[in-house]
């Protein structure tokens, strides 16, 4: 009789443990879904065709902000290409939108990274100061290089045309979230038919047919719409000989730098 009682108790404990494991699995799946939905919500800034809309957009605030400071948005888009036996070339633009003064300045940049015969690496970067008025980027100084001048005139930030409405349908390789910081990240394998990939290929010379991986990183409270910073990277090729990737970032900082 005692043997039967022990067996009964053992089976009962086993059932409880199995139920607990199943419950944890469900909770985990639900959390993953919640993170993906939260990503979709915080990525609502894509697209924002009129950059001046950021003057009225609130962001995630930490202890660095002083009372009364509305903060500033820092927006950056950059394409980097390094082909076999060639220099690494990065081109992009960064602007800073001050919500207190409602003014915006920044620079367009061209950076070339070279390696000499001895393996030493050198970086040559040229910056062209710009400002934004009426949602238009305007050079602050005369530019003799017609190619650079045209690149500035035609430049669009990824936030102006990127769209993540299909995010929930993306197949993630990895998703993580730390609510205490709070920071979060997600990695996806995209297809060339993806809208954002098509837009990047339309605007940039991307010398590969390989579909990119998308990496999203950010900070801010996923329970509301505030944003601290957001990094987006489309990696087409990444190895020791060749690199092709596009990066986009949106930061919300105090208006006065330390």
From Swiss-Prot:
A lipid is attached at residue 21 (N-palmitoyl cysteine). The keyword Magnesium does not apply. Keywords: Cell membrane, Lipoprotein, Membrane, Palmitate, Signal. It is found in: Cell membrane. It comes from the Bacteria. Disulfide bonds: none annotated. GO terms for cellular component: plasma membrane. A lipid is attached at residue 21 (S-diacylglycerol cysteine). This is Uncharacterized lipoprotein SAB0395. It comes from Staphylococcus aureus (strain bovine RF122 / ET3-1).
